[in-house]
Structure formats: structure tokens, C-alpha cells
Amino acid sequence: AEHLTEMMTQVCGTAATLEDVSSRVPFYIAADSPAIQTLITTYNDVTGENKKPFTMGGGTYARHFPYAVSFGPEHTDIELPEFAGPMHGANEGTPFEKLIEALKIYILALLRLQEIEL
């Protein structure tokens, strides 16, 4: 928080103030860790794609566990019917085939994660 205040003061001078800043220790697991490599390999094996792991801003439930990440398919290219809402939105929807594919990914990933040393 102090670093943010200092940076803002350098950029804005006295034209702005920063109050009630809170921050958390960053939560990060390296992309080359065995667990992340197992997850992305599993995803790519099931889907036939060649995706790379990525990080995102914001907080997730994963930070409440000692060694966890958010993981799952994201299909922004799929056209949904009018009644289906976007990911994490009201009436979230996806085609049934993609639900089955996700289930395969999760089951295989869990089986593979049991075989590695964390």
C-alpha cells in the first residue's frame, strides 16, 4: 500500500490522495511447476488444443488452499442461445458436449495429479 501511495504521489503530486488501501500477498504458482504442467497437458490431451497456462488478476477461492489454482476450460468462441448467460453470469450456460469434455478433463487431471510429487 505504501508503494502505491508513493507512486501515485510521484505521478499526480498533490492533485490526488489515496485512502484506505488494502492489499494481499500475491498468490502465484509458477507455470513450470509439475502440477501446472500436469493440468495444462491434461487439458491439451483431452481437447487436442495447444493452450498455455496463464495468470489472471483478481482474487479466487484458490488462495484459501496451500497449493491450489483455478483451472478449467474457457470457451469464449462458442455461440450460445439467447437464454444462456455468459461465464460466471446469470443463467450461465454451455453446450452439453463441453460439460462432458470438462468432466473428462477434471477426472483425468485428478488421476494424474495423484501420480506427481508436489
Label the model's feature ranges.
Residues 1-118:
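Metal-dependent amide/peptide-bond hydrolase catalytic core
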